[in-house]
Every structure is written in C-alpha cells, then in structure tokens.
C-alpha cells in the first residue's frame, strides 16, 4: 500500500498499565498490522519496555501516532524506527 511503512516500535510504560491491551485502539487507527514481540521489565520492575513490529497505515501520520502513544504512556520513552535501524542504543 502506498504510504504505509514498516517500523520497529519500542514503548516504555508504567507497570500499572495492562500492556496487552493498552494501545489497541491507537494501533487499530494508525496501523494495519502490529505484533508484540518482546516485553522486558526495567527500573526494578516498575516499568515495562514493549517491543512491537508494526506497519503504519500512513507514514505521514507517524508523529500524530507517536503523540497519541505519548499521551497514553505518560510521556515515557518511545522509539519508532525503520526495521534494523533503531535496535542499537547509544
């Protein structure tokens, strides 16, 4: 589909959020496909780092998509990158 884009998405959320459903409505609006591929605890278990593989419906709405995620996760860290480009952290 023209304008769609594959992305690796990493989102940090507080342990109080249910990671299996917390972003479903946002994903259904902005992605044509999303798959949770990894869950990692961090900060002594008080945070979850979620890793997804997604396909954006419209790459031009990537910032809008990230803004919606930020509202939901309390403005914690989010990384959205092309596959293979955002997996190394400095």
Name these PLM-found stretches.
Residues 60, 65, 69-70, 90:
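Amphipathic alpha-helical interaction surfaces in cytosolic regulatory modules
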Residues 16-17, 55-61:
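Helix N-cap motif at beta-to-alpha junctions
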Residues 40-48, 81-90:
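Short proline/glycine- and acidic-rich turn/helix-capping motifs at secondary-structure junctions
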């Amino acid at each position: 589909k023209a304008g769609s884009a594959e992305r690796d998405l990493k989102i940090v959320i507080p342990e109080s959020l249910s990671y299996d459903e917390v972003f479903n409505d946002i994903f259904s609006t902005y992605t044509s496909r999303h798959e949770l591929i990894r869950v990692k605890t961090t900060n002594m278990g008080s945070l979850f780092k979620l890793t997804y593989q997604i396909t954006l419906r419209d790459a031009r709405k990537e910032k809008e998509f990230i803004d919606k995620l930020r509202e939901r996760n309390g403005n914690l860290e989010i990384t959205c990158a092309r596959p293979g480009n955002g997996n190394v952290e400095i």
